[in-house]
């Protein structure tokens, strides 16, 4: 089977190759014999019989139907011929004053060039009219002489050169010269012999080459052309234009032939080479995406005024005096490890651990927490609003949570106005910090009981207390109108991760909540806006104030060690994630609206179908009632007059009524 398929494939391939070769030969043949169509135009006049029937032909040629034209008996025409009315052709006398516009004059000169250029060339070459007519007669009889084209001459020359080529010595040029010299020596002899033959038949088809003419010959040509209605200089100018047009046509034809040669399935490489050859001399500018590199986020230089005003808040690189040391977090949760990491970070940043911090200034950060202030103020400068400050605090707290407990940073870095589960997690961290900072708080008192008692609480009560404590923060920031919504939102569900983290017992969760509350109280006590602090925090007792002052240095060290600077790529990633979340919510909302709309349309369609079915049933019922009434009328009429005449009709109507009564519509 495989051999048969191979044989068939080989046969097909051979047929295709033969067809291609045949088409190539046919194309070459037609290219050879192709000429100007005007050269094939020949007009011949002969006497012939129009009618095949001899009787009809004799009747048509009888003197009754034929008449001499212009009195010439040798030239007989039909009397219905239109030439019978051309007995007298009046001579044309042009008007003396001719007003011709410049456009008409230029058109007339062009027409004269097309009419008489052959005669002008014959006059210039000294060829008489008899010689020209004889040459035309010879061409009509035998056709034009086939002269080898320039391409064929080049091919023959290449073949001759390749025969004389040797690899031992480079004598190719000499061989070519030797091969060309006999040709040049032979050519004058050939020309002499040809000239002897062409004395009788001069070659008048050779067009005058304008580029080879000198000034005298050009002037002579133009002078010869003026006798044929052309202006001085028109003939040579139009000859040049014709030559340029012929060159352009030849070039376009060569291009098309090259393209046709490269057509086919296997000629992709040849087409590419042809395209590269065409575009080799052209200069191509690089595309826009290759012209510039991707942006680099190196620290850029700033003006002295900007750097002096924002050096504390915007500087990313550490000063040469205090270079930061990179500390790697290797363990989570232990208080000893946290204290050691905080001490290492404080030593690296150059802060004295035993030195108490100065009171916070509203204009700038405290000196005891330079590292944390430097990192925090990169995301929120002193000129930004309080809302952006709170968002940067939440992002810093989420990163602290990532380093402490190994949670995913993105799930905590969202603002609590984004989604409900994230708002519950965020309010939980807020409420924990608030419970440890506010001694007189009711929720904090309830939450700070023993671990066993706390784990025994119902989930609803726990979520309610948590939502209330988070709601107090919301009330301080936004107003009292969010209490019911956050209470209802947070009381109906608890995420598994949240319930797991709440039921987890031991010193790890307590120390984590303690460190969170300390960092939260420290960040709120160092907030640069005093009115926000008044809104969000009630008045605390002096003991709580002392506790806060004691915990401030440790919290500053922790934030300085555990809060990294966000790179622009990470910032862009966060922004893209937020945009994706927004788009997801919008798509979800649009899908819900679409589903509601489809449901509404379905209900409307069902109602319409129900109404249509009801109408159809009513019409059917009315039709049945009409038929029944008609039948009863007919039956009563027949029962009144039971004559034998109507007995057949009566029986047929009875039969019809019986069949109708059997149908389900007429059952009583």
Curated annotation (Swiss-Prot):
It is found in: Nucleus. The modification Phosphothreonine is found at residues 327, 567. GO terms for biological process: mRNA processing; RNA splicing. Residues 182-214 have a biased composition (Acidic residues). Belongs to the splicing factor SR family. The keyword Transferase does not apply. Residues 340-353, 378-395, 487-510, 518-527, 636-645 have a biased composition (Low complexity). Residues 354-365 have a biased composition (Pro residues). This is CLK4-associating serine/arginine rich protein. Residues 265-283, 396-435, 475-486, 653-668 have a biased composition (Basic residues). The modification Phosphoserine is found at residues 101, 285, 294, 331, 335, 541. Probably interacts with CLK4. Residues 579-641 form a coiled coil. One of its GO terms (cellular component) is nucleoplasm. Residues 173-232, 252-668 are annotated as: Disordered. Pfam families: DRY_EERY. The gene is Clasrp.
